[in-house]
Structure formats: structure tokens, C-alpha cells
């Protein structure tokens, strides 16, 4: 179904509630907002299959805007609200967006990138005035709530890493199905996690991430209520569970860690008995952390392994995990294969590249080389991880290819920081990679070879950190920099980053489980 169908039977039922203010939007209001939004897109000249982009913090309008694009049969790209203006402009241009929507929260960046997105003909601001942008609220008031045609499903097109370190859009074919038809994610929400029209789904993560956005969309299709937190805070999370009697929630392991660091008296002060299903993914979860969470909340914790690409899906419940500690689950969509560097399949227990054999079809937008590199000749595709499968068919992730960093559930691609730091006048060579962090799982570390090694000092470290932060979102930048007289490079120019990385991991090992 879709919000309009739900509204026919329960028009006043809350579809969205902001956890901090209690502000709510009913299913009828959500449907009418989406219809007006779809009409606005169509009136501007956008047609099914075209692209729109949005960069918003977690706020009431986020999901209704996405639903408007969905109603209009458009691709919609949600951009991280942490990005700088140049990073935002790159994604807006790369996805080919004809419309861009942002809020006063990103007003400075919106103004900075105005001249850098020449193909965007519809520029809209939410929550106030931004120079060069039309106010969305005023334009929506002029739009009808009549359906636009043709009535087909839109789709998100979210961004992953590219071969150069730049993000790349993960594009799947438009569904070509009637608006409201059940999709794979919505079906899984009901099948695996028991989601239904009575579900109260608490969403503490940024909505621009694939899983939160798709889970919220699926809950709306089922007819459940979505509670949106502006940001994650452990106490506020527990307060929201108690206040709204949340039944379902998706988190990342860092949130588990922050919750467990609360005093026991603080944890026990809140009633979380309404929870029926808690799902985690997106980052490594230390075995002791997961054990403690199961002890606290019970066997309601689920885990999955999948990607924005939608090429496969592994899953385990608490019982499965307790009998196979460290697993990320069994494949329930697609068939798992572990292969060596030549593409030959490996036996049980052997470590190699993790591939899915499935009907899932995706491409990296404007990057055929990356698309090809993610697939074998037989059609199997990978998310770039390596791991092993046990005799029961459970998957264990062992390491990450290309040393992608996962810090607090956020994927960070070190090539971006390397490209920036390399351009600094004092830098001769640089390597960026993840090092252990008890709270975040990993943090970003840089090792730099200076043009003049004698300049190595805390002052130069601060200079380089600030230089990076001026050009990239802070989350992508190193937290610290070490200096070396020379970095380990092969005569061909290949950097042996593993040699550097392993020094910092020590007994922790470069392992995900």
C-alpha cells in the first residue's frame, strides 16, 4: 500500500512523529503533502525516471518530500547533511538532479554551491528563506492534491564509494509497478521483524542513509507509525522508547556501545518492555557488546548484512547468533559464495571475497568500471567484503577490501582525505586508514611523509587537520596524524597500506567479528 491507501481507513492515524517536539503528521496529511509535492515536480517539468536531490537534517518534511518524489515516479537522492558544499555539488551534478531541496540548516552550503549546479532548475528551501531558492511551503500551497500520472513507483538512488574515492550512486531499475505495490524491504519487515499496522518504529539514525530511509518507507506502506529522532542520544533514545511505546527500532552498534556506557541506574530508569524487535547492521558489533544487549533487552535483537546495492541479504536472530557468535547471518535473499582472487569458489571455512548469486540488478551511476569490478563473469556480485562461511551456512566477515573505514556506522572512504592531504604543499606522501576505537569501532588515522621530515611537529599536524576539515566533512577527516620518513611503497607505486594499518591494530587484528 501507500499513504493514500492507509489514509482511506485511518486518515487521522499518525504517520510521522518528531520525538523531541511531539509534532505529528497524519496519514492523510502525509498523502496530501506527497500529492502536492508530486504535482510540483511535474509542473516544473520532471517526469518519471528523472532525478531529484535533497540535503536535509532529520526533520518533519524529510519523508514527505521523499514520498512526493516516489509518487511522481522519480529517482530521489538523499545527501548527507554532514557534507561540504563541494561534496554536495558533486553528488547533485553526478546524479543529474533537476531539483534540489535543502533547509536553512544548510543555508551556507546551499548559497556556496549555487553556481556549481547549473543543471538544477528547481531549487527549494525548507523552513525559511535561502538566497536563490524558492520557499517550498509557499509553492506547495499552490499545488492541487490530485494524482499525477502515470501512477508508478519511484526509487531512491543513494551514494556509495567510487574507484577514485568519490561517492558513486547505486542505481537500480525503477520498479515499473503500481504505486503501493509491496517491495522486498517491506516484505522483509513483516516476515522477519513482525512489522504491521500496529508497529511504532523509532528511527534514531540519519534518514539519508539507505536502511533508515527504506525502513521508514516500508513501515508507512504497512501502515505503521514512524517516530523520527533529530539525532541519536542514548538517554533521549530510552526516553522515546518509553514515551511512545516503540515496538521496533533499527540501530548501529555504536548506539549499543553508548547505551551500555550509561550508568546501570540510568538504564534501569526507563521502561523498554514495549520493544518487540531491534535490528542492527552497518558496522562491526563486538561480541561482548551484543551479548550484553541481548541480556538487557532479551532475544529480540536481529542482525542483517546487505548493501545499498540490494544484491543479497543475510540475516540472523538472537538464537542463531548465540549459537554462532560473530556471524552476520545466513543468506535469505541470494546464494552466498566465497571466492579467491581468480573467482574460483572456496570450500567451507576458507577466507575469500564474499559474493551473492541473485537476481538483484544494480549499477554504479556513471561508473561502468566500478560496476564491472563488483561482478564476476557469471553474474555474482560483491559489496567488497571478505569473509568465510561455516558448515551451517552462516557468514562471518573477516575484513574489508579497499580498507573502507566504518566509524560509528558511517562508511568513510580514505581516498577522499588522501586526495586532499596530498595537495598540501608540505606533504610528499600520505596514507589514510582506520584504527581501533572502542566507542566507534574505527577512527580515521593519517600517516604522512613530509617533503621536509624535519618539519614534523604538533603544529604541522594541527595545520594539516584543519586543512582537511576545510574541504571535507569532519567525519571523513583524520582525528590524528603521525609522521614517517618514508611510506612503504612498491616500485610500481602501490602503497602497502596493510603494513601501516596492522601496526595500529596489533592484538585487535583487522577483523570485523
PLM regions and their residue ranges:
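Conserved AMP-binding/adenylation subdomain of ANL enzymes
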Residues: 178-204, 208-248, 262
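Structural core segment of the AMP-binding/adenylate-forming
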Residues: 3, 43-44, 67, 71-142, ...
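Conserved AMP-binding/adenylate-forming core of the ANL superfamily
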Residues: 15-59, 63-66, 84-89
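Gly/Ser/Thr-rich phosphate-binding loop
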Residues: 156-158, 162, 221, 246-251, ...
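AMP-binding/adenylate-forming catalytic core of the ANL superfamily
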Residues: 83, 89, 100, 239, ...
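Conserved AMP-binding A3 loop
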Residues: 24-28, 155-183
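AMP-dependent adenylate-forming
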Residues: 2-26, 128
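A short helix-loop-beta submotif of the ANL/AMP-binding
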Residues: 51, 57-85, 93-99, 199-200, ...
